[in-house]
C-alpha cells in the first residue's frame, strides 16, 4: 500500500508547505470551501485542548474534521455517569476511566490523518517551552484563575487562545489573539491582497472592564463571570454554591464593583442571582447548547488558523432560552 505521506506534493499558491495528493483528495470539499492555502495552514497547525468536557468534544470534532495536523488532550478527570449526557466520545463503558485517553479512539475515527497526543500535565506546570509547541490553545475550565494563567502564557508566546464553557442553557467563549492579522482579496482586477489587524485584550484585562461603560443589552453572564473571576483570583478555587460565606463574599464583590464604577440606582440583586445561576449550572451540560456553541467556536478556530477573514473579538454569549447569540468586546 502506498504511504500517503510519500505521495507527490501539491504546492500552495504562496509557495509554502503544501498538501500531498492524498490529502488534497481527502480534503477536496474543504479546499473548495476555503481554498488550498487555507487547508495547507490547517494541516500545519497544532491545537492544545485543556478540559475535555461535552462542549469541548463538539469543538474537537469540528477542528479534527477540518484537518489540522495534530491535537493534544490534557484532562485527567475520571469519567462518571454525569459526564455522559453531552459528550461525543465516551459511553457507559467509559465510566471510571480517564477522559482524555478514553476519547482518543473516537476522535481518531473522525479523521485518521490527525495525530492525537495525550499529556498528563497540570496547568501549574505548563511553561513557555510547552505552550510554544502549539498554534492555538483552547481551554474549558471552571476555575477562571486557571483560564487567566493559561491565557497569560499564550499571550506571552503569541499563541492564539480561546476559553469556552457552557452553563446549562447558556454558553460563551472568549478569544485573545493578541495582535491578529488576516488577509482578504479585493474585487478589483487584478485582485489585490489587503492586510487587516485586530487588537485583542487579555482575559484578566477583560474581567476588569469598567461596568459603567456597559449598557442595557450587555449580557448578564458577563457581570457574573467578572464576579466569579475576582473571587477565584483571590482564592484560586471555584466558590462553593452552598457556602454562606462564599455567597456572602460574592455579594460583597458585586457591591464593591457597583460602588467602584459609580453605578447609581443599580439593582445588585440581579447581578447576584445571575452569578448564582452560573455557579449552580457550571457542571450542567446540555447537548444542543454544546453543539451550537461548539460549532461557532470550531468555525472561529478555522478562521483564526487560516487568517482569511475577520474573526469575533472578543466575547460571544449564547442564550438557549431566548435562542440568541451576542458578540461583545470588553
Curated annotation (Swiss-Prot):
Keywords: Nucleus, Ubl conjugation pathway. It is found in: Nucleus. GO terms for biological process: protein sumoylation. Pathway: Protein modification; protein sumoylation. One of its GO terms (cellular component) is cytoplasm. SUPFAM superfamilies: Activating enzymes of the ubiquitin-like proteins. GO terms for molecular function: SUMO activating enzyme activity. Heterodimer of sae1 and sae2. The complex binds sumo via sae2. The dimeric enzyme acts as an E1 ligase for sumo. It mediates ATP-dependent activation of sumo and formation of a thioester with a conserved cysteine residue on sae2. This is SUMO-activating enzyme subunit 1. It comes from Dictyostelium discoideum (Social amoeba). The gene is sae1.
